[in-house]
Amino acid sequence: LEAVGAEMPTTVEELKDVLLKFANEDPNGNGVKDELAMFGFDGGYRAEIVQYIINAFVYCNKDNVFNATEGKVWNPYVTDEYRQALIYMNDLYAEGLISPMYYPVSEDAELKALMSPADGVSMVGIAGAHPSLHFISDFYRKYFTFALFFLSI
């Protein structure tokens, strides 16, 4: 965040502004536009960043399709808030703020893509992680420059 002169975002609008800075500025300082603003993968243990962002609009636990509020069961996938979340995510994707590799990759492919940049330095603005992962192992420090904050629910 310091490298792009940004504060920790607290709204989805602020998040988009930070992602734009990650994508359009050069936070790793190598003079090449090679940063990924947001990257994760669907199927990784709590690495599905999209799920975290959707929860900014409506609580949506993909492992439990229904919610219960005040004794009423309801499905978040048919709410206006969920539709707004999809519109927001579509906008992020259309602006190149979500990596196009997000859905079609496996965990191995994701790591290979991030660990093999031409200049040997990777920069990811936002990466997903389970809240219990409170440390970054030496393995990841070897390959990644973390300018990021971890999202958790």
Q: Where in the sequence are the language-model features?
A:
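Extracytoplasmic/secretory soluble proteins
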Residues: 1-153
